[in-house]
Amino acid sequence: MTKKILSIVLCAVLALSVFAGCGQSSTPAATQAPAAPAAPAATQAPAATEAAPAAPEAAPAKDYTIAVMVKDSSTPFWRYLVSGAMEAGTDLGVNVVEYAPMEAQSLDEQTKQVEDAIQAGVDAICIAPVDSNGIVPAIEKANAAGIPVIAINTKANGGKIETFVGIDNEAAAENLAKYMVEQLNGEGKVVIIEGNPAGQTSVDRVAGFTNILSQNPGITLTVSQPGYFKRDEAMTIMENLIQKDPDIDAVLALNDEMALGSWQALDDAGLTEDVIVSGFDGAVEGCKAILAGKMVASMDQDAIGTGYEGVKAALTILEGGTVDEWIKIGGKVVSGDNAQDYLDNFAAHGFSE
């Protein structure tokens, strides 16, 4: 009798074990993509960076590779942009591959890199064109291969572009020019150090500057000359201008690198007390220069946010979604009032220079 009872108990235990096992799935729980990093405290820093998009609930439909093409690999601005793109790749679960010409601003190299990316079978291309017209044939090749192209920072003037991610360069330049005219009290001789005249970025910024300068009768634009976004080029230009005529009141450079090169030439000539300088990027060194009194202003472009939003837009398109024709970010004047806020934001992303 005892053995019979024991047998019944054991059978009951076994049955309960089986039913308990059926209540648990043998498939592991779905792993979510890593969450986006917590946004820094609200400051004057780039809006797109502060409000970084949250990671998707599930991984993308396939293992996408997105090429991010910049104009050079050494300038801090482009390092920030690539960092934002890589951050998006981690958050959104896609592979991001950087392409940058060995020679800064080289159209030939960038064209070859687009062709290489097509051959490698990338799923999308985010590109900051070195030459807005010259890059069009390469973009058309990507179009023909069925690869969506997103323009970042600089517009392309042809081919099919899914969206442009970046600042409104002309409007931003107008705002910066207004600030500089205020610093001059509406009077003075001004020099513009342009970027690459073949790039739409440079064209738009020069247009923005000249729009405002021409509206102020007390302002004289004495020279507007390309420095190709290079510090040493800008320094040489300023050295030559100073030798010809040192009567300069302000320098408006189209990026921080050229602003700092211009300042160095002015400093060597003992003219920094008489001339105010502005840049365009809101990069770490530019912000530090503003706080040190070397520059009076720059323009926030939110490079980190540009890279992030470019990759995010590419993924949205690859997944069959739609994006705005122009994803606008950045556009605030960086001055002594908010430069430290920008430095704090860069530090939160691991950049101190």
Describe these PLM feature segments.
Residues 1-10:
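Positively charged n-region of N-terminal signal peptides that target proteins for export
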Residues 18, 22-353:
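A residue-level marker of the well-folded mature domains of exported/periplasmic proteins
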